[in-house]
């Protein structure tokens, strides 16, 4: 490589172990970056919740895990909610590890959308950086992002200009779009396959709209994703004729792309500001048109 290799500590989301699907798009973003950075010769240490599985094609990657209680997700909290860290929470345990490992590293890179690592940044000896993974969902998060921007906005990057526009920043944002290894996706050109939908099964993803489309057409909708809100999933299923939804669960990329590639279209129906529509890119990489709003 043209520049000397760096010692980097990457910190995963505290919402579920890496490989569980609970972290949503953050998992795909993180694993893609792990592969890309390792391929460029950087020395990578990954800090993640207990049970996490690192990509098997990242030679030399060191995995350190921490246990503890799950961290609540900000997108399901009230907008005016206070910062919450459970007793024996995995989030502070992850950051105890990260700050210790980061003392001799060139940088510690945070992938979680959480108040604690953002607040720690001006106070830590390690050089902390953040890839902000969501738009505005909380006043507390808006405030800490704005405070960090005033202190040193170079410590943060965003996925898109639209996402960054949600926040009060002091200068134009740094944008890091997601990269995809297209060799991991097989192009399939099917004109008569089923309809598909993929994402976390939660209200902000708008599955009910895609289900209504499938019901109106008298077709089955293939649904991939972790059921994050079981009550919501049941209400969506109850609103359409029996058999409309074919639940496929969370699938790792190599399985998802095989099944998704058989569809004639992917319906994409988010009801919030998606920071980056990973599944839209994945569908197109498989040759599947996307119908979205």
Task: Tell me what each language-model feature is.
Residues 1-293:
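Catalytic cores of nucleotide-sugar-dependent glycosyltransferases that transfer UDP/GDP/TDP-activated
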């Amino acid at each position: 490589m043209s520049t000397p290799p760096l010692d980097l500590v990457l910190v995963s989301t505290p919402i579920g172990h890496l490989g569980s699907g609970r972290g949503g798009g953050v998992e795909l973003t993180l694993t893609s970056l792990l592969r890309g950075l390792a391929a460029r010769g950087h020395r990578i240490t990954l800090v993640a919740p207990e049970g996490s599985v690192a990509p098997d094609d990242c030679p030399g990657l060191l995995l350190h895990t921490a246990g503890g209680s799950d961290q609540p997700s900000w997108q399901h909290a009230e907008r005016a909610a206070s910062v919450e860290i459970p007793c024996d929470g995995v989030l502070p345990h992850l950051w105890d590890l990260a700050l210790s490992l980061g003392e001799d590293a060139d940088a510690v890179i945070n992938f979680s959308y959480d108040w604690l690592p953002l607040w720690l940044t001006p106070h830590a000896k390690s050089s902390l950086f953040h890839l902000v993974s969501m738009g505005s969902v909380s006043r507390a998060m808006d405030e800490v992002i704005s405070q960090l921007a005033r202190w040193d906005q170079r410590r943060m990057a965003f996925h898109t200009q639209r996402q960054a526009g949600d926040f009060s920043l002091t200068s134009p944002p740094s944008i890091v779009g997601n990269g995809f290894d297209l060799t991991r996706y097989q192009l399939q050109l099917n004109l008569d396959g089923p309809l598909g939908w993929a994402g976390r099964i939660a209200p902000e993803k708008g599955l009910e709209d895609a289900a209504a489309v499938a019901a109106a057409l008298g077709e089955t909708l293939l649904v991939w994703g972790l059921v994050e809100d079981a009550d919501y999933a049941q209400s969506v299923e109850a609103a359409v004729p029996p058999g409309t939804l074919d639940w496929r669960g969370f699938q790792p990329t190599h399985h998802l792309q095989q099944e998704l590639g058989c569809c004639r279209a992917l319906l994409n129906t988010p009801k919030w500001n998606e920071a980056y529509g990973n599944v839209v890119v994945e569908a197109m990489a498989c040759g599947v048109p996307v119908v979205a709003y």
